[in-house]
Amino acid sequence: MENQIQPKAEVAKLELEAVIGFNGHVPTGLKCHPDQEHLIYPLGCTILIQAIKTQEQNFLHGHSNNVSCVTISKSGVYIASGQVTFMGFKADIILWDYKKRELMARLSLHKGKIEALAFSPNDLYLVSLGGPDDGSVVVWSIAKTEAICGSPAAGLNVGNATSVVFSQCHDEMFVTAGNGTIRVWELDLPNRKIWPTECQTGQMKRIVMSISMASDDSFFYLGTTTGDILKMNPRTKLLADTGPAKDKFSLGVSAIKCLKTGGLLVGSGAGLLVFCRSPSYKPIKKIQLQGGITSISLRGEGHQFFVGTEESHIYRVNFTDFKETLVTTCHFEAVEDVVFPFGTAELFATCAKKDIRVWHTLSNRELLRITVPNMTCHGIDFMRDGKSLISAWDDGKIRAFAPETGRLMYVISNAHRIGVTAVATTSDCTRVISGGGEGEVRVWQIGHQTQKLEEALKEHKSSVSCIRVKKNNEECVTASTDGTCIIWDLVRLRRNQMILANTLFQCVCYHPEEFQIITSGTDRKIAYWEVFDGSGIRELDGSLSGSINGMDITPEGVHFVTGGNDHLVKVWDYNEGEVTHVGVGHSGNITRVRISPGNEYIVSVSADGAILRWKYPFPS
């Protein structure tokens, strides 16, 4: 009997064209490759290799969970990356071949999390530190891709080791440091052992955040949470000096880099980038950047270097004039919505906590940023004429901005009691329909200078998650997390039809012929409904695991796209109800997905701040 079951047809893969995103929270996650042409950085469970000049991107897929550390060998031949996993499970280290852009080996020994990685100067060994639940340090042979030896990383009476650096000249020495522990290790290869020596810092108790070795191994420098720098001698294991005595770096020294000339580049948790020298450590040059600095990576000898911050900014800094240029930026919080202007795929807007951003589609460049401090924007929509961008905020206000300049045009205060959760506009640009956290749907008349409430439609019992308007502006449908979808008559301003289901509806779409709607939500089902009488037509299993949060349909109504908590973008055939293509690449829950006008791209956004652009799989 079992032999007769036909295997399912192979589902095609969506082609990933570009990623806008950078996880700035990974310590020393941003790396400049020794070929000086590429930046390497993590985003969720993928690693991006981006050409500095052409912005061309390659992706390394292989981790099953978020990447927690990245390192590159001195020769540039290998990349190693570690990941986080669940408590008690093995966390993988992956060794990549840089030239071929492919996985070479999976090194699995640590549990829970890989804290830090470092290559030896001649590419012989890789050293790895396990996370707080693991607490061990392991040396791996790169030639044999197997572990040589391991040991507990820190003593019994001190905290965890969190950073590691290899000697610049010898393959047999490395340093680990962390909470109250600084150790110099010697590798004894014939006996397959590593011998630690605890470094003496006297009365000073420090938690080390960052570490860097001088190019001749004469000293290594440690940045601490206290905001000062320790200079240690690896031969004598003694403290050489510390500083600055006054004006310590605010929020700790989160990144540190030795230069060949003998100076230090120091990045603080408050976003201050400083060039200083031992023993005074007084700033010689300094600039203020946005977000705490987590990575400093030199291009070549350090005539130019790249800086990564927690707010997902990547800066390029020339050493001589010490001026910063923003290279890449993206959202560092969950992206709530994405929308294209009517009739053009050249640009699109996204919104998240604190800001709305407008992006140029082909170059991935940020064209405009509109910031409203300490507020979250839940939804956006362009007016059909392109003169205003309407946004829904959690402080209960609807704000309209000019899309070219970001100028605030008007605010509708107290639009909803518990924040505005969804917003839509009519094609004649005279009305805005908004939904709130308390479940009200409100219709606003927008004049030249006035914004007037036409009607408050009170039916939903919980927050409104999605609003779609019919082409003739006489009807709209609202989806709510109370398990109802309501079709409203926008002429009589009354309810036409109500759809009930045992789910929290997250998204709804009109079929272009507007006699059917499709809905989806937390029950993972995609349901088709008749608009006329609200009866169910069919139901599909949209996902095997997790809610479906975003949905969009093509203007022809032949295909539609969904995305949700299974991190997959799926393209469906509307009539057949079959998945035709699947896009793998997100590492956070997908919150919204859109098909661009003209069916060129699919843009999906996720809870980890990433924006992914996919090639639309069918000829438009």
Curated annotation (Swiss-Prot):
Gene3D superfamilies for this protein: YVTN repeat-like/Quinoprotein amine dehydrogenase (2.130.10.10)
InterPro entries linked = WD40/YVTN_repeat-like_dom_sf, WD40_repeat_CS, WD40_repeat_dom_sf, WD40_rpt, WD_repeat_EMAP
Subcellular location per UniProt equals: Cytoplasm; Cytoplasm, Cytoskeleton, Cilium axoneme; Cytoplasm, Cytoskeleton, Flagellum axoneme
Q: Does the keyword Phosphoprotein apply?
A: yes
Q: Where are the WD repeats?
A: 62-106, 109-150, 156-195, 203-242, 288-327, 330-369, 372-411, 415-454, 459-498, 500-539, 543-582, 585-620
Q: Name one GO biological process term.
A: microtubule sliding
List keywords of the entry alphabetically: Cell projection, Cilium, Cytoplasm, Cytoskeleton, Flagellum, Phosphoprotein, Repeat, WD repeat
Q: Name one GO cellular component term.
A: axoneme
Q: State where it is primarily located.
A: cytoplasm
Signal peptide per UniProt? none
The tissues where this chain's protein is expressed are given as: Expressed in respiratory cells and sperm (at protein level).
What top-level branch of life does the organism fall under?
Answer: Eukaryota
Per the record's keyword annotation, is Repeat included, yes or no? yes
- Primary role: Microtubule inner protein (MIP) part of the dynein-decorated doublet microtubules (DMTs) in cilia axoneme. Important for proper ciliary and flagellar beating. May act in cooperation with CFAP45 and axonemal dynein subunit DNAH11. May play a role in cell growth and/or survival.
Q: Which family does it belong to?
A: Belongs to the CFAP52 family.
SUBUNIT field: Microtubule inner protein component of sperm flagellar doublet microtubules. Interacts with BRCA2. Interacts with the CCT chaperonin complex. Interacts with HSP70. Interacts with AK8. Interacts with CFAP45. Interacts with DNAI1. Interacts with IQDC.
Query: What's the name of the protein?
Result: Cilia- and flagella-associated protein 52
Query: From which organism does this entry originate?
Result: Sus scrofa
State the organism's lineage. Answer: Eukaryota, Metazoa, Chordata, Craniata, Vertebrata
Q: What gene name is given for the protein in this entry? A: CFAP52
